[in-house]
From Swiss-Prot:
Entry GO MF terms: (3R)-hydroxyacyl-[acyl-carrier-protein] dehydratase activity
EC code: 4.2.1.59
Annotated gene: fabZ
Species, as recorded: Aliarcobacter butzleri (strain RM4018)
GO cellular component entries: cytoplasm; membrane
Protein name: 3-hydroxyacyl-[acyl-carrier-protein] dehydratase FabZ
Annotated active site: H48
Length: 147
C-alpha cells in the first residue's frame, strides 16, 4: 500500500529513527497496519544487549506511534502540501505492556485502531506482533501541530 519512499513523504523521521518499512493496509479514520523488518544491523543492538540482542521496547512503541502518525495525517483534511508543514506530537502513551521479546530476523507487525479522532487530536490503540504472537501493546494520545 505505502512503501518506504511514500512513508518518507508523510513522516519527518529518517534513519536511524524511521521505524516503519511498509504500510500494508489502511482504512482512513479507522485503522492501519504496517511492519518493520528487524535486522542485526539495527544501531540499538550495539548495546541492547551484546551477545543477546533484544529489540528495545521503547523502539517498538515508537514504531507503533509512527504508524499511528501516518494514519492521523492521512485521515486529516490536509492536502499533501499542507501535510508537509505538520508533525505529530504524542502527548501520552498509556498501559504499555511488553509480552514477548523481539529479536534480529523478526518482522515486527504493527496494528493500530483509532478509538477517537477529532480534527487534530486522536486516541489510538496499538498492538505489535511477531509471527502472529502479541509482543507489545499500548494506548497513544497524539495531536497534529505545525512544524
Amino acid at each position: 500500500m505505502l512503501d518506504i519512499m511514500q512513508i518518507q513523504e508523510i513522516l519527518p523521521h529518517r534513519y536511524p529513527l524511521l521505524l516503519v518499512d511498509r504500510i500494508t493496509d489502511m482504512e482512513v479514520k479507522k485503522s492501519i497496519k504496517g511492519y518493520k523488518n528487524i535486522s542485526i544491523s539495527e544501531p540499538a543492538f550495539q548495546g541492547h544487549f551484546p551477545g543477546h540482542p533484544i529489540y528495545p521496547g521503547v523502539l517498538i512503541l515508537e514504531g507503533m506511534a509512527q504508524c499511528g502518525g501516518v494514519l492521523a495525517l492521512k485521515s486529516s483534511d490536509l492536502t499533501d502540501e499542507e501535510m508537509k508543514e505538520k508533525v505529530i506530537y504524542f502527548m501520552s502513551i498509556d498501559n504499555a505492556k511488553f509480552r514477548n521479546p523481539v529479536r534480529p530476523g523478526d518482522r515486527l507487525d504493527y496494528e493500530l485502531t483509532a478509538v477517537k479522532m477529532k480534527s487534530t487530536l486522536m486516541v489510538l490503540e496499538g498492538k505489535a506482533y511477531v509471527d502472529g504472537k502479541l509482543t507489545a501493546e499500548a494506548e497513544f494520545k497524539a495531536m497534529i501541530v505545525d512544524k
